[in-house]
């Protein structure tokens, strides 16, 4: 039995992780609707589930990771109309932008990134099968899911049909039998992108896309289905209803959801004007700092985005990079062996075990980062020894690299050119002149992390490589 325990939204408790097939994990993560650049809420989901994938691979699992693109949707059609472009052109542009953003954030590409428009036939077959089983019906070119027929509806979001009924309404123009029913196929309106189907020209509804693509690429039952907390209902609830009605099997064994992201203690929304796009923010800050920030809170908890917390994350990452850099620079001056090598190697092994213990407990990256800080503390203590050995230094470096890689963090730093150092010193001098001491300190810390030591003298600032 695996020592990993994860919180399952379906059961509302932590459970031992036992994939359907030993050592193999089938994982589906709901991807973006590509009508704009992704915002930092999307980035949190991308970073969180990339890290969970990395950790499962670190623990020896063979992970097949699928994350979709919704490349046809009401929002895309609206954007195309406003910009005077085609839906495929807009989708293609923002898919490319998505890959650029997540790569900057240290996220690996999924094994498969299916697009809705490349899977229309699969979706149509799925819908037809639901009609054949009595779970869906067609009205004037629209196809709806018969929600009440699926008796377990509400089991993921822990709501009863009666509770859901109270808030359900039929919109003007909808012809469904029941307010709880939802669209599987939408009849085309004039000028909209559409495909031929047994019910006339149209396009898929949102919920059916993920059910059809998850089944096509991962089978009837998958190990982990994941996404943002806001997708629990109705999206994931509807996916379960569709998939389990068709196959008669559980759709996913474990459901994982990351918590909300707030901006300065307010919900992020366009109406409040606090919408932060990854495309913009990574031009202002190191993307690794944003990733570190996202992982500094447990993935299920809400996280508050603010300048102060980003600055705290920057300092934390700098501490780790400085410890790693100091080890690298000490390597050349180290001997082959010292008397207490085994004691230090044992300490490092204990720290690795602590990291695994924390991450095994529902992927607790916040505590995992705390363990990395302990590794940095022990490394700094070791470097105070009169003599150091290559064996121990290598053990520290290897542990830093492996554990940081699980979190998608890179501690190695490219060496600065002399002119780059001089430019940063000039920028620091200007900041001090303008009494912007926070910026001056930040530049000094960044240089120190890259092993550049500054000395302020009456004649000006001198520097040397440590």
Swiss-Prot record:
Keywords from the named record: Aminoacyl-tRNA synthetase, ATP-binding, Cytoplasm, Ligase, Metal-binding, Nucleotide-binding, Phosphoprotein, Protein biosynthesis, Zinc
Q: Which organism is it from?
A: Geobacillus kaustophilus (strain HTA426)
UniProt cofactor(s): Zn(2+)
Q: Which residues carry this modification: Phosphoserine?
A: 271
Report the sequence similarity comment from the record. Answer: Belongs to the class-I aminoacyl-tRNA synthetase family.
- Where does the source fall among the domains of life? Bacteria
Signal peptide start-end: none
Q: Find motif ('HIGH' region) and give its ranges.
A: 32-42
One Pfam family of this chain: CysS_C
> What is the designated name of this protein?
Cysteine--tRNA ligase
- What does the UniProt entry say about where the protein is found? Cytoplasm
What remark does the entry make about the cofactor? Binds 1 zinc ion per subunit.
- Name the Enzyme Commission number(s) assigned to this protein: 6.1.1.16
UniProt xrefs under SUPFAM superfamilies: Anticodon-binding domain of a subclass of class I aminoacyl-tRNA synthetases, Nucleotidylyl transferase
A GO molecular-function term, please? ATP binding
Subunit composition and interactions = Monomer.
Q: Which SMART domains match?
A: DALR_2
